[in-house]
Amino acid sequence: MAEYLASIFGTEKDKVNCSFYFKIGACRHGDRCSRLHNKPTFSQTIVLLNLYRNPQNTAQTADGSHCHVSDVEVQEHYDNFFEEVFTELQEKYGEIEEMNVCDNLGDHLVGNVYVKFRREEDAERAVAELNNRWFNGQAVHAELSPVTDFRESCCRQYEMGECTRGGFCNFMHLRPISRNLRRQLYGRGPRHRSPPRSHTGHRPRERNRRRSPDHRHGRF
């Protein structure tokens, strides 16, 4: 019996523990869920809840009407956000194996930033310190996440461009960063954590901020 319960833990067959929380670290039912959300006491992965704000969803004019933001502007805004958060966390807490940002619209997933550190101790320290910090005018809510394999958490239909649930899908729709930024961030090892420089010698993040003051982000 014990072996059977262990084999179905966190799966659809498990009637006690929430499979969505186990796979994704979030559940649309929240505290009202009829199944248990077993929050980990240790993990390599942390989640920063609702941290990223897509300007296409939030941009408004003074009269409250929706302000159009182009796809190019959104990608630049997102790359700046991603680089700043990744660099800041890696410099302060330790080497990051993987960082992912949800582009879903559901309240339990929108803007969630998942950061998988190489060491569990670094993740634990990050959670303890980040919950006392602010970013971009909002309090940071960080917690350890059960997610370690993002292949199990992602919507496969979305990756193939075929998800019919849209932004309210309960599996992760991960927003990609630009190819150049991916090479810059993941191409450098733990001994090279300073922000990458362009061929001009300037740090891209600083250059982008001077060019686009409206797209500045608050530091931790």
Curated annotation (Swiss-Prot):
Basic residues compositional bias, start-end: 189-220
Tissue-level expression: Ubiquitous. Highly expressed in the brain.
Residue ranges constituting the RRM domain according to the UniProt record: 65-147
The annotated consequence of P190A reads: Does not impair nuclear localization
One Gene Ontology biological process: mRNA splicing, via spliceosome
**Assembly state and interactors?**
Interacts with GFI1, U2AF2 and C1QBP. Isoform 3 interacts with PER1.
Quote the record's domain comment: The second zinc finger in necessary for interaction with GFI1 and for alternative pre-mRNA splicing events.
Write the protein's name.
Splicing factor U2AF 26 kDa subunit
Instruction: State the organism named in the record.
Output: Mus musculus
